[in-house]
């Protein structure tokens, strides 16, 4: 019983994650070569897809960022039970963009929340770094 209580306690803690490297982004086959003279770059805190009206609507977020060639997103939810995909993956599918979800912490041993990058162009290498060590809900 004590061991089960220990596992539940550890699982419910928020854990920060280490950096990683990679060579491709999810759905990179959908990217296109940059041929223009202008590039639209955006950043958006999606607040887990909750708008100022309190409604959660990820498709509304997709409409807002649809004109960006590259967009960085903050407060992106990780995979949900049942779907197995994070919000960045869904946005990438709908907008036909390569997507990378970078969880900043785990909860119940799974990626919980983090940042994301969506890109219309091929990415040959990526790296995410933990900017500072952090624990707890304050980060």
Residue ranges and their predicted role:
Residues 5, 9-34, 50-54, 75-139:
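Structured beta-strand-rich core segments of catalytic domains in phosphoester-bond hydrolases
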